[in-house]
């Protein structure tokens, strides 16, 4: 390990919260507990801001794979702070294959992506087709984050629906995407449920998440409850 990366690891251990480590480890069954230091997200984000743009950060970004969960999250937060689109995209694509849990996958989104929605669709399609669990999940997350408002097109619903997998963390994101689409684009999303165009698990899970959401009107929730399919 490069000395710069060793220094950053020591900084992370200095921020360790053992009680938080125990609690958070239980939420991530795919992450070995011994690889979790126990650093809270606000502290990681503060450290990322301190390191951003430094030579130390550049060395750290090249030090893949990392040994600890928090090193991966710090890596993600450093990518978020990159202001150049091409560089942020390149670092994201280099990092995605090393993500091994939902929490790291869902924790970051480079701010510069919001200014390049048209260009971002190309890598999103590539991520959806990758076959890698968390790369696929990340692609769906980007569609959910940036393309359910003014940039929405009905075909994006098809992109997510066309992802076929037995992986839990992919299918949970598919359901989350459709639940969010019901809140933001109900006219386009609702027919996917009324016409039963999704697989049974995603259909029912999307309804469950939508009914639990505060963004869905009560009338819509009543309709959705009636669309549940009993297996």
Q: What is each model feature region?
A:
Residues 1-231:
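Alpha-helical scaffold domains
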């Amino acid at each position: 390990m490069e000395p710069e990366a060793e220094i950053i690891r020591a900084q992370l251990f200095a921020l360790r919260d053992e009680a938080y480590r125990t609690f958070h480890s239980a939420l991530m069954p795919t992450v070995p507990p011994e690889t979790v230091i126990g650093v809270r997200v606000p502290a990681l984000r503060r450290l990322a801001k301190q390191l951003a743009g430094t030579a130390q950060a550049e060395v750290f970004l090249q030090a893949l794979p990392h040994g600890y969960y928090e090193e991966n999250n710090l890596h993600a937060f450093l990518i978020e702070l990159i202001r150049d689109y091409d560089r942020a995209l390149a670092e994201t694509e280099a990092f995605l294959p090393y993500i091994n849990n939902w929490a790291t996958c869902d924790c970051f989104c480079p701010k510069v992506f919001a200014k390049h929605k048209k260009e971002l669709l190309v890598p999103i399609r590539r991520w959806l087709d990758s076959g890698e669990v968390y790369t696929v999940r990340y692609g769906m997350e980007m569609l959910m984050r940036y393309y359910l408002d003014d940039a929405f097109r009905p075909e994006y619903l098809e992109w997510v629906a066309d992802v076929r997998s037995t992986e839990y963390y992919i299918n949970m994101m598919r359901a989350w995407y459709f639940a969010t689409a019901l809140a933001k684009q109900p006219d386009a999303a609702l027919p996917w449920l009324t016409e039963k165009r999704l697989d049974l698990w995603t259909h029912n899970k999307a309804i469950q998440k939508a009914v639990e959401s505060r963004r869905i009107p009560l009338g819509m929730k009543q309709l959705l409850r009636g669309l549940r399919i009993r297996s």
